[in-house]
């Protein structure tokens, strides 16, 4: 077996790993890198058309965001994911593609004015629609035979890992010719314990090799806060002042948790003097996501949420909930003076309808802006949390007079205690642990802790290649060890998206040529003539 790390190695985003085993090439996750690059990215060593299968741990864009790019560049094989992950990818990938198209359109307007060549989006909405035909949804806990031939057998099983609706760790049982079966587990993102709605992370049982995330491998979340009590206090204070509670929220996962909290607040009558206060969700993506949550309750909800469903209650709905679908609905929210809760995306305030709600509410001292998720450096959300007195929205200065608060403790990722508990629940120690999906220092810290506990562990680099056999791993290529640093020198020009696609098509053509070996001479000659004609046309 050979394992190649192509993303999220000593970084948090862009998860992508290549496995070559039993005569087949598999990709596990195909995520988009978000934020700043820390290490130089590596080119995929194989053309998308040569991949035999793709497996996804969950639907977050940093794990699935390049799936339509694979399709655009020739991949037509199966994509295995849980039912809920498949449903969420159906909306998240189209949303990502829409953003890609908008960014390309904006860049091309600038390029046209400066006389530069136009750029193509990494993929289009149509690519995102088309790739969904390749998905083959799977249930939790069932073994699936991916390949079974002379070179060996590969089976897969998905285990709920409690990070997001449909999230899973993936166990691959690999039997190569003449060898005993070995188990390779990809943890995916391991969920935080005792979070609302979805189940706690489950252990897949055993592994010979483990690829394990380390997002919070150097810290603890501390005691679990009483989210509902804290949210009630903030809401009561805001409504008493006659203001709106504006909540920037991620459309998938966090918004549904908030609806769960507000249902409890209303059901228990925790707010006094404001009966029937409205809660408005102003995000088309959040609306679609909430529908998917409701449709997947039987597989993914925890006991508490499932008990509500079985008693005839909807855990994500309550009197006074309004879903805003159209732009007209969104505009009307701020013309209505009734004090209310407004939940809108994006969670870091850098895009989406939330910016309009901030424009109308930030300057009002009776209002509150409540952050319920991580705010990255450089985002408007971080700027507000750090105490800015004025911000710019749509080119205009807006005074910050509203109260700015943060709901502490909400996280979809396990802390170091949660990671350790998950690992220690394996029936035996994995022979080797690869630590990924963590910032450089964090991944190294977690790998060192595992080594101190007696595990063979390492934090690979992007491009790192390892041979696996007999429970041991041997590094045969280290990968990119040099960190990217800013330079005062002019950066080298980057290849255009169109040129990158051309390169990918060239690799696809080579893959077809390789597969044509042994074909009929007549067909091969015709194929060669067609390629020669194409070369003659474009040779300069």
Q: Which ranges hold each PLM region?
A:
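Generic long, charged, amphipathic alpha-helical segments
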Residues: 392-423
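Short, compositionally biased "basic patch" segments
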Residues: 196-211, 297-305, 375-401
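Hard-cation-handling environments
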Residues: 234-379, 392, 427, 442-444, ...
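Short, surface-exposed amphipathic charged segments that create phosphate/polyanion-binding patches used
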Residues: 152-158, 292-300, 420-421, 470-481
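A general structural motif
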Residues: 190, 223-228, 317-329, 348-350, ...
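Charged, amphipathic alpha-helical linkers/stalks
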Residues: 463-526
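Conserved acidic residues
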Residues: 52, 208, 340, 367, ...
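His/Asp/Glu-rich metal-coordinating catalytic cores
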Residues: 1-55, 60, 64, 71-257, ...
């Amino acid at each position: 077996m050979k394992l190649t790390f192509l993303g999220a190695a000593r970084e948090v985003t862009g998860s992508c790993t290549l496995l070559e085993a039993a005569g087949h090439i598999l990709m596990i996750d195909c995520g988009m890198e978000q934020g700043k690059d820390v290490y130089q990215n590596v080119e995929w060593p194989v053309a998308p058309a040569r991949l035999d299968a793709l497996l996804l741990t969950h639907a977050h864009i940093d794990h699935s965001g390049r799936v339509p790019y694979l399709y655009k560049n020739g991949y037509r094989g199966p994509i295995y994911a849980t039912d809920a992950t498949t449903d969420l990818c159906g909306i998240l990938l189209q949303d990502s593609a829409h953003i890609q198209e908008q960014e390309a359109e904006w860049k091309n307007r600038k390029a046209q004015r400066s006389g530069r060549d136009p750029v193509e989006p990494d993929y289009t909405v149509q690519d995102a629609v088309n790739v969904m035909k390749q998905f083959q949804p799977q249930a939790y806990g069932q073994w699936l035979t991916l390949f079974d031939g002379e070179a060996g057998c590969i089976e897969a099983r998905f285990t709920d890992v409690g990070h997001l609706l449909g999230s899973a760790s993936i166990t691959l049982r690999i039997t190569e010719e003449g060898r005993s079966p070995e188990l390779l587990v990809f943890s995916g993102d391991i969920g935080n314990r005792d979070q609302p709605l979805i189940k706690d992370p489950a252990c897949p049982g055993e592994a010979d090799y483990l690829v394990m995330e380390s997002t919070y491998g150097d810290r603890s979340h501390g005691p679990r806060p009483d989210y509902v009590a804290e949210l009630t206090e903030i809401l009561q204070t805001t409504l008493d002042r006659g203001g709106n509670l504006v909540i920037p929220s991620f459309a998938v996962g966090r918004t549904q948790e908030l609806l769960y909290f507000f249902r409890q607040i209303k059901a228990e009558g925790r707010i006094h003097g404001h009966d029937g206060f409205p809660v408005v969700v102003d995000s088309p993506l959040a609306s679609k996501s909430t529908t998917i949550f409701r449709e997947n309750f039987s597989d993914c909800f925890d006991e508490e949420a499932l008990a509500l469903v079985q008693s005839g209650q909807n855990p994500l709905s309550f009197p006074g909930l309004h879903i805003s679908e159209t732009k007209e609905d969104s505009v009307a929210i701020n013309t209505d003076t009734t004090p209310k809760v407004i939940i809108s995306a994006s969670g870091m305030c850098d895009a989406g309808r939330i910016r309009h709600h901030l424009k109308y509410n930030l300057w009002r001292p009776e209002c509150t802006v409540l952050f319920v998720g991580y705010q990255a450096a450089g985002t408007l959300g971080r700027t507000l949390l750090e105490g800015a007195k004025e911000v710019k929205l749509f080119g205009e200065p807006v005074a910050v007079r509203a109260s700015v608060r943060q709901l502490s403790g909400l996280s979809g990722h396990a802390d170091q205690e949660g990671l350790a508990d998950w690992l220690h629940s394996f029936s035996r120690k994995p022979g080797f642990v690869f630590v990924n999906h963590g910032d450089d220092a964090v991944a190294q810290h977690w790998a060192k802790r595992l080594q101190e506990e007696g595990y063979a562990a390492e934090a690979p680099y992007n491009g790192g290649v390892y041979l696996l056999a007999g429970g041991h791993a041997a590094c045969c290529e280290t990968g990119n060890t040099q960190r990217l640093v800013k330079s005062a020198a002019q950066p080298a020009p980057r290849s255009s998206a169109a040129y990158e696609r051309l390169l990918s098509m060239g690799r696809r053509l080579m893959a077809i040529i390789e597969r044509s070996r042994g074909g009929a001479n007549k067909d091969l000659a015709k194929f060669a003539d067609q390629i020669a004609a194409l070369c003659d046309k474009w040779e300069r």
